[in-house]
Structure formats: C-alpha cells, structure tokens
Amino acid sequence: MRIILLGPPGAGKGTQSERIVERYRVPQLSTGDMLRAAVAAGTPVGLEAKSIMESGGLVPDAVVVGIVADRIEEADARDGFILDGFPRTVEQAKALDAMLAEKGIALDAVVEFVVDENALVGRIAKRAEETAARGQPVRKDDTPEVFKTRLDAYKRQTAPLSDYYAGTGLLRKIDGMKPIDEVTGDVTGLLDGFREKATS
C-alpha cells in the first residue's frame, strides 16, 4: 500500500498517519526525517543535501526525490509507505511520479483530509486558550495569527496538488471535520478496499 496524505495544518494528518502505520505496518516517510537520516548516513544525495543546507540554501526537488527514491528501496518500505509532507508542489509531484514510474512502482491513493478553514482556526485558538489556562506556554505556531499564515502558505503552494491528483484519478477525499475515530474508520475503510484489491 503506497499512499500520500494531503491536508492543511491542523487537519489531523499526524494522528491518522500514526494509526495507519499501526494498522498496516507500513512506514511513514517524512522528508525531514529522511533528509536527516541521509545526511547522517553520508549517502551521495545526503552529502549533496548537507552541503546545500550548510550554505543556507533550500534543498532542490531533485535531491529530495533522490532521498525518497533511496528510502523506498529499504526493506521496511518494500510493501508500502505513507508519504506525509511531500510532495508539497505540483512540480514535486511530477518529479515523484517520474521516479516511481522508473522503478515500476504505482501509488494506490492520495488521501486528502478536507476541513473547514474557519473551524480549523477556531480549533487552534481553543487549543491555545486551554494551554494558556493550564499555565503552560503556547507554542508559537499554535497562535491563530501564525496558524493563518501557515494555512495561507498551504493554500498557495500545496492545495493545487488536489487538482493535480484528481486528474490522475488517485485522489480520495475524507471529511476531516468528523470526530477522530470516525475519520480513522473512513480512512481504514478506504485502505482496506485497496488492500483487498491488491491481494485478490
């Protein structure tokens, strides 16, 4: 099972991907973790990424795709993986598609968590209030202002992926506003269907 998770910050991707990992025993691949691991392991793409990051540059798509390519060759990812946080742009999606096609690997689905923006901002504001009421420091990215900025960046950069993957026939939308366990039920219902198809 090979899937990509999409959705704005605060949509519950983290919680759902943990549950998918637990249920289906496939690794969650986060580009940040993969970059750090590749740098630590001293792989050719890791060394390239390291020199770019040390000079303060942004790691180009080709290098990130190279790191993803190396990671999905590892034993634990052979039967499937969850990509979370990548691709972020249509250009990255196209580069990922080309790399997977070269390896003869097909994605099963792109799961997008659809949420109401105003409700999301309200959810974050409530979380910040509750944290402050407990006398704990509020995380900087948990303030409504910062969250709104992250949401705007997502809409500008990543939201077009929804149209891109809809065009490939891979996009599946899940209502992320339901209670967490109901969302999990919708996700597992969808993924169980893919698994049955793969084994039949």
UniProtKB/Swiss-Prot annotation:
Region NMP, residue ranges: 30-59
Primary enzyme class: transferase
Region LID: start-end pairs: 126-142
CDD domains in UniProt: ADK
GO molecular function, one term: adenylate kinase activity
Residues involved in AMP binding: 31, 36, 57-59, 85-88, 92, 139, 150
CC terms in the record's Gene Ontology section: cytoplasm
Reactions accelerated catalytically: AMP + ATP = 2 ADP
Oligomeric form and interacting partners: Monomer.
PANTHER family in UniProt: NUCLEOTIDE KINASE
This protein's name: Adenylate kinase
Organism: Methylorubrum populi (strain ATCC BAA-705 / NCIMB 13946 / BJ001)
The gene coding this protein: adk
